[in-house]
UniProtKB/Swiss-Prot annotation, chain A:
Disulphides: none
Name of encoding gene: RAB8B
Phosphoserine, modified sites: S180
Protein name: Ras-related protein Rab-8B
Residues that make up the propeptide removed upon maturation: 205-207
Native source organism of the sequence: Homo sapiens
Swiss-Prot record, chain B:
Assembly and binders: The exocyst complex is composed of EXOC1, EXOC2, EXOC3, EXOC4, EXOC5, EXOC6, EXOC7 and EXOC8. Interacts with CNTRL. Interacts with RAB11A in a GTP-dependent manner.
Keyword Protein transport: yes
Function, as annotated: Component of the exocyst complex involved in the docking of exocytic vesicles with fusion sites on the plasma membrane. Together with RAB11A, RAB3IP, RAB8A, PARD3, PRKCI, ANXA2, CDC42 and DNMBP promotes transcytosis of PODXL to the apical membrane initiation sites (AMIS), apical surface formation and lumenogenesis.
Protein name: Exocyst complex component 6
TM spans (from-to): none
Keywords from the UniProt entry: Cell projection, Cytoplasm, Exocytosis, Protein transport, Transport
Compartments, record wording: Cytoplasm; Cytoplasm, Perinuclear region; Cell projection, Growth cone; Midbody, Midbody ring
GO biological process: exocytosis; Golgi to plasma membrane transport; intracellular protein transport; membrane fission; mitotic cytokinesis; vesicle docking involved in exocytosis; vesicle tethering involved in exocytosis
Pfam family, one: EXOC6_Sec15_N
Amino acid sequence: MAKTYDYLFKLLLIGDSGVGKTCLLFRFSEDAFNTTFISTIGIDFKIRTIELDGKKIKLQIWDTAGQERFRTITTAYYRGAMGIMLVYDITNEKSFDNIKNWIRNIEEHASSDVERMILGNKCDMNDKRQVSKERGEKLAIDYGIKFLETSAKSSANVEEAFFTLARDIMTKLNRKMNDSNSAGAGGPVKITENRSKKTSFFRCSLL
Amino acid sequence: MAENSESLGTVPEHERILQEIESTDTACVGPTLRSVYDDQPNAHKKFMEKLDACIRNHDKEIEKMCNFHHQGFVDAITELLKVRTDAEKLKVQVTDTNRRFQDAGKEVIVHTEDIIRCRIQQRNITTVVEKLQLCLPVLEMYSKLKEQMSAKRYYSALKTMEQLENVYFPWVSQYRFCQLMIENLPKLREDIKEISMSDLKDFLESIRKHSDKIGETAMKQAQHQKTFSVSLQKQNKMKFGKNMYINRDRIPEERNETVLKHSLEEEDENEEEILTVQDLVDFSPVYRCLHIYSVLGDEETFENYYRKQRKKQARLVLQPQSNMHETVDGYRRYFTQIVGFFVVEDHILHVTQGLVTRAYTDELWNMALSKIIAVLRAHSSYCTDPDLVLELKNLTVIFADTLQGYGFPVNRLFDLLFEIRDQYNETLLKKWAGVFRDIFEEDNYSPIPVVNEEEYKIVISKFPFQDPDLEKQSFPKKFPMSQSVPHIYIQVKEFIYASLKFSESLHRSSTEIDDMLRKSTNLLLTRTLSSCLLNLIRKPHIGLTELVQIIINTTHLEQACKYLEDFITNITNISQETVHTTRLYGLSTFKDARHAAEGEIYTKLNQKIDEFVQLADYDWTMSEPDGRASGYLMDLINFLRSIFQVFTHLPGKVAQTACMSACQHLSTSLMQMLLDSELKQISMGAVQQFNLDVIQCELFASSEPVPGFQGDTLQLAFIDLRQLLDLFMVWDWSTYLADYGQPASKYLRVNPNTALTLLEKMKDTSKKNNIFAQFRKNDRDKQKLIETVVKQLRSLVNGMSQHM
């Protein structure tokens, strides 16, 4: 079967139960919103194809259950993720405090070079806000990662969040490929070797 | 004489004639004399001679007599001469006496003239008095008539006119004033007619304006009577009858304004007071007008006018407002107007003689009933609010009962109510469709958690769930069903209550109501709830979580149907032994929904598999395999493993079927990849890599991801792929071709067509390699072998075609 995309990026959504992970994914993949909270059981995913720098990028976005009882299952997917979004609910301070725990989980189970991003969801409910934007930004700065406030309901910043993460992954990928190219020099045989290396590298990335 | 006759010697005939002349009247002499001339020619000369002879005889006789009485005559004359003197004396005396009398009587004459004048006057006076005595009663009566007209006592005025015409006018008809009076009476009669008609028109306008109040009162009475005992009803009927009695002889002379006799305030204060139509409206104008027209002999005109006007009013009353169906008050006003109209007609029917007849009111009612039914049928079809339809039913029942109490047949109204009941149920079904949709919308599709005994009992009280094992568990614990299950159960019962409400007061037996309720509930379950469930299941974005929970939910709802049957039986109070002609079919609804949900689970899983397969990125011309299964496939296998791991509450058979369906779908997808017409070349290395992936599938199948499979049942999903790949990797064509068609063949499931398709893709590869491998013996030999096998496979395929 001929490939219909140029790159496959695997993203992962993690965070406390009820912060809006599934709603964010639903907004991004279907551009719709469901007011009823249905707790995710185990693991689910959606695929959306985007275009970046003229390349077709397939985003496979894994949606994890935030409940403790599914932790074993969801942790197994950390290893394969190229980008991870840590989501908290601005109306729920506890979910914000738990971001530190989620980051610790990532450090324990994910690749060391995984791209990360913190999202403060439900920013449309400002009247019930418990976590200020400044606190969110400060936490992200402390860990050296990007931060956005989003609303799956109003769709504020949702596209931006996923595109930002995808672009960061692409940037990192391109940097690695450039490094690999500069290492090689010389005759045709070396060119062949470089191609082989690139192919091998690409396949490793997918895995 | 005889002697004279003999001496003359006359003819006997002439003798006879002379006798006749002397004896007959002068008038008859003519014919006698003519007979003289008719006789002999000279007869009249002889007759004249005889006549002269008779004359001389008579003269002689006279002379004798005179001679005889001569002396007496002389004596008499002498005495007369003496008397002359005496007379002359007497004359002087009388003249003198007369003169004295005249002088003395002059005064008397004067007095006498006075007396005469007085007597004439008296006579004239007497005559005048007599005449006047004839005229005065007439004038008095006419004056009375005028007075009665001014006082608006028209009936009395008519009586007076009648007396004038029949009794008084004949006495004085010769007088001018009497003529004037006679000429004026018809005008007065017409005036009375017009005034009475004007009163009637005012009355008609009044009862039209007050129809609402009349009808409202009558309907309230009908409502109240339902709460009375039989004896109370009898008592009311007697009272009502008494109130309806009218003594025609006591028709009031005074005309009151036609107004409601009770103010609204009085009505409020005496809400329980039983009023009759006569307490609300003054009917005297009708009675007076009817009698006036009867007396005037124009009763038919009055009747025709009254009926015509009332028919017009009926049409007005029967014409509803265009937006009547929007509120219950719209219907109420419509009904009260109609009731008011017919109550008035019924009253007039009973208290008048012939103004309206039973035939007339029946005709009017039949016309009205057809119109009412058409109106209600049209307007009720606009109602989308079941509460409004229910209110309409209640109003219609009161309306029908009210008019039935007045003797109007209302069976067709109850027939209409059954039509409206069907529409009511349709409206309920629509409403409950919304209710169910909301319930499904708000459900979180997770088992209901309860943290203590109190919460546990709350759920149990809503939904008849019985499970000893769950009951023994310690808190916190979970019910297997989600929140929508008790909500739906409660709402089905609410629907039954709402449907039952319509049947109240419709005079149907409990058994009929029970059957109707079961039919309605069946529609709710088999159509409305079923549609909602199926729509829910087919929502584009529904997830496996929801689908799994729906399967569990429908199982419990299905088990609860027997409690709904008991609920209906209890609510209609029919005997437990009664055989139900209608049973609940909800069971099939939930079975169907469960099947649909299961099918949707399989579909969703297969869609997920398709998404993974689209990520496949095989290098179909690779010379050596990676040594590991493809990444996309490992993700896929892990995903399936996770799914079946977390949905442990999925019923066993469903989980098994889902797992089998997924494996079969995966196998088919992988096979399709190999046979894809757009894929032109496949290397042996690619085949080997592909084989690594299939091995992973087989490992998954043999790992019993879902309990309950027997032996290698699940692995059978991949058997076709396994045999095909083995054939190619072992290059075991001689065995395949030799054993083809044998039941015991190692490659029984390899289709020659499939093998041919795949082999040709590999041949193409060899052709390309051929350029560089011209001089390698092994490669040349392999090429020849491929060509040989291709030919043989082709013949097999053709052979199959011939057989087909």
